[in-house]
């Protein structure tokens, strides 16, 4: 196996046979323990002629959370806009069908479900302010 990751459980044994080991640990204390703790890997890999390379991961948990929330918000804006366009088009289609006496079998049901959901959402929003 050319590359291994420091891990637990079933993955640990195959990783011990890897040519390269990658660690991605949450803190400096964890890294120190993994490399030079009581059962650290540093002594064994040094005997094999291993070298250490550092490539720290930028950012932190807080920054990653903010980035993920921002990406989610951006995608939700697109979803909300698509819903607004869809309900407008559904209303136009329903009006056209009514004026030409052409039934849209599930169109009116979809429109009614949207109206029902909108009123429930409005009610919950008003309750939230109190």
UniProtKB/Swiss-Prot annotation:
GO terms for biological process: valine catabolic process. This is 3-hydroxyisobutyrate dehydrogenase, mitochondrial. NAD(+) binds at residues 1-17, 25-26, 30. It catalyses: 3-hydroxy-2-methylpropanoate + NAD(+) = 2-methyl-3-oxopropanoate + NADH + H(+). It is found in: Mitochondrion. One of its GO terms (cellular component) is mitochondrion. The lineage of its organism: Eukaryota, Metazoa, Chordata, Craniata, Vertebrata. InterPro entries: 6-PGluconate_DH-like_C_sf, 6PGD_dom2, NAD(P)-bd_dom_sf. The keyword Amino-acid biosynthesis does not apply. Keywords: Acetylation, Branched-chain amino acid catabolism, Mitochondrion, NAD, Oxidoreductase. The keyword Zinc does not apply. Belongs to the HIBADH-related family. 3-hydroxyisobutyrate dehydrogenase subfamily. Homodimer.
